[in-house]
């Protein structure tokens, strides 16, 4: 049996501050309405563009208009009241992607949808990539803090959009990354780097699936210093999602090695995992409380935060 809660459990709302003119955004959710015409209806946005695979490693122009009109690999949507609307070739708007959008005025854009599937970035080697990352709103890391431990990016030039032009980030230690922002960065060689905290899951295609045998998330500190990591569990208001952390008990008299739940409640909760030392990796196991499950399948979100200001969102599906 599937319920509205099962569908709502993976959803959240992303708030994006849109400026007049060109904006470089990173969309973190898969919109409930992914048709560009319907999603953008009623907003002052008149152009949306995203870059799929570049066919060359050519340098980009500092002018967004040139990128859209002359470079290969762009899909562009244009509002129907524009004279060039017939050139639109943009089927859907999906999460986990960087976009250039043009707005006639500034406004606050609320986009609701399912958290996009967690995955590592598919970097194009020896090329500039238009990318974005999940970071804390108003408290993100500096570009240096985020990229200094990636050999493919630590010395790479970064360009962010300011007043409609791409501007080189000259002081990486002083400029902070922003939630919902995308930027250009050069990838020197092959890489799958996605931030100072790496997450791994066996069932990463569908998110974290917690079934009869449980599930787990591996956390790896890729930096040369400690990282303070915390975790939050998000469920729709008034709903429950019975999953718990699992702990290993090794000194029980009758069952010397067994798994027991660390009861954190049935709804929303937060838990300070631990301080991860430099290069340390840990496994965070979960078990579902089948007796408390109201449906055969229930969904929620896990958010992992670091004291650097990075965060990772993961879809969770518990199966009875």
Model-derived regions: residue spans:
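Asparagine-centered strand-capping/turn motif at beta-strand->loop junctions
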Residues: 103, 187, 217-225, 235
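Terminal connector regions
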Residues: 157-162, 275-320
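Short, hydrophobic/aromatic beta-strand segments
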Residues: 110-112, 195-196, 225-233, 243
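Low-complexity, acidic Ser/Thr/Pro/Gly-rich terminal tails and inter-domain linkers that flank the onset
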Residues: 192-209
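Intrinsically disordered, low-complexity Pro/Gly/Ser/Thr-rich segments with frequent PxxP/GP/PP motifs
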Residues: 240-293, 311
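Short, solvent-exposed loop/turn segments enriched in Ser/Thr/Gly
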Residues: 93-97, 179, 210-217, 280-282, ...
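N-terminal exported-region signature
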Residues: 4-197
